[in-house]
């Protein structure tokens, strides 16, 4: 379990309140699919993913990215109970979708890069460290049901 200090919680929520979930979620998922193309196999129904520009402009990628980041927001609200917050999603991704849990870590790292690019100097090393704790905790919670 990840322990969040009061400073961590402030660092995370101060950024989260300014995040455009649709925009950042869409970009984060799209970047994941471009940089780690093997992750595309989970998104066969999304249509054209044949090039970086196709992925970045794909409306289904953007919509699912929003859905993913909206769910991530539940983790922001429930930092002290990440395992419980993501229990059902962990089960879904493990038992039905068979997603490699390493992909959760990769997406978390991409999210941090997108946030850093959006927030610039406001995304200080301390803020980044707090966000690393959060994405690590969320990744661990999502991977919890795996055997």
UniProtKB/Swiss-Prot annotation:
GO terms for biological process: hydrogen peroxide catabolic process. PROSITE patterns: GLOBIN. Heme b binds at residues 64, 93. Red blood cells. The keyword Mitochondrion does not apply. InterPro entries: Globin (IPR000971), Globin-like_sf (IPR009050), Globin/Proto (IPR012292), Hemoglobin_b (IPR002337), Hemoglobin_oxygen_transport (IPR050056). Keywords: Heme, Iron, Metal-binding, Oxygen transport, Phosphoprotein, Transport. Residues 3-147 form the Globin domain. One of its GO terms (cellular component) is blood microparticle. Belongs to the globin family. This is Hemoglobin subunit epsilon-M. It comes from Didelphis virginiana.
């Amino acid at each position: 379990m990840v322990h969040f200090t009061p400073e961590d919680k402030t660092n995370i929520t101060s950024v989260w309140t300014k995040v455009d979930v649709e925009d950042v979620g869409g970009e984060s998922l799209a970047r994941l699919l471009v940089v780690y193309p093997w992750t595309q196999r989970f998104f066969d129904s999304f249509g054209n993913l044949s090039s970086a520009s196709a992925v970045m402009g794909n409306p289904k990628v953007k919509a699912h990215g929003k859905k993913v980041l909206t769910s991530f927001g539940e983790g922001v609200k429930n930092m002290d109970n990440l395992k419980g917050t993501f229990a059902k999603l962990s089960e879904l991704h493990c038992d039905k979708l068979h997603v490699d849990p390493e992909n959760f870590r990769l997406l978390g790292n991409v999210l941090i890069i997108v946030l850093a690019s959006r927030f610039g100097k406001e995304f200080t090393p301390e803020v980044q460290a707090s966000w690393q704790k959060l994405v690590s905790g969320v990744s661990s919670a999502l991977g919890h049901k795996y055997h």
